C-alpha cells in the first residue's frame, strides 16, 4: 500500500509553479491539482480578485485534506514562501501523508521578466517583497522530502559566475572592512580551518550572496544615509542559492544565518543539533573581518 502524497510547491510569481504542476499532472494523472488562483476564481469568479486570503486558503486546505483522506495524491500550488504559509496545510494533513516540498526555482530576473508577459501581472515590487519573506523549507517543519526544480535550460556555472561577480562590491558599512565577496571567502577559509562540515563551508562561501540585490542607502524610516543597509538579505540570498546548489542544508543555513543576530524565536527553539550548525556559521560570519 502506498501513502497518499502531498507535493507542496514553493516559489515566487513567475517561477513556473503552475506550468510545472500542469506538466507533472499530465504525466501523473493520479494527482489532484489545487491552485490558489483556481480557488480565487471559484470563490470570486475571477482569479485576478485577491479576495480574503484566509477564505482562499481555508477552502484550499479543506479540499487538499479531503483528497488525501480519500487516498488521492495532491499538488498544492501556492507560493508558500514562509514557514507560517506552509504550516497551515502541513498541520492539517492526515498523519499518513508523505509530504514533499518542491521549490520551483528560476533566477529573480527571469521571474520578473516572465511576470511582465502574464495576463495577471503582480509587478517587480511585489516579487521583491515576497523574496524578502522567503524562508527556505526544511525538514523540521514536518516535510519528508525537499527538492529544487531548476529550469531545463539553466546553466549553473554561468549563474554562479554572475553571482560571485555581483558580490565583488564594497560593503559601505562600518561593520565590514572587506567587500562582500572577500568577507564570504574569509568565512569559508575559517570554516575550513575549523574543520566544520561541508554544509557550513558551502554556506559560508555564499551566505551574503543576497546583499548586492538588496543593498540600499535608505533606512527603515525612509531616510537617506551614508551607510549601506541589507534588509532581509538572508531571505533573498536563500532564493539565489537555490540556483547555486541542490544542498538543502546549505540553503537553509543561508536562510537562517541572521537568526543569532536577530535573536529570533525560531532560532532559540531549534534543537541542539540544528542550533550548533547555525552557531558555527555565525562564528564564521562574525570572525571573517
Language model regions located:
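Conserved GTP-binding G-domain of TRAFAC-class P-loop NTPases and closely related GTPase folds
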Residues: 10, 15, 108-159
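Acidic, metal-coordinating catalytic cores used for nucleic-acid/nucleotide bond scission
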Residues: 76-89
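Acidic/His-rich, divalent-metal-binding segments that scaffold phosphate/diphosphate chemistry
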Residues: 149-225
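Divalent metal-dependent catalytic cores for phosphoryl transfer on phosphate-bearing substrates
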Residues: 190-289
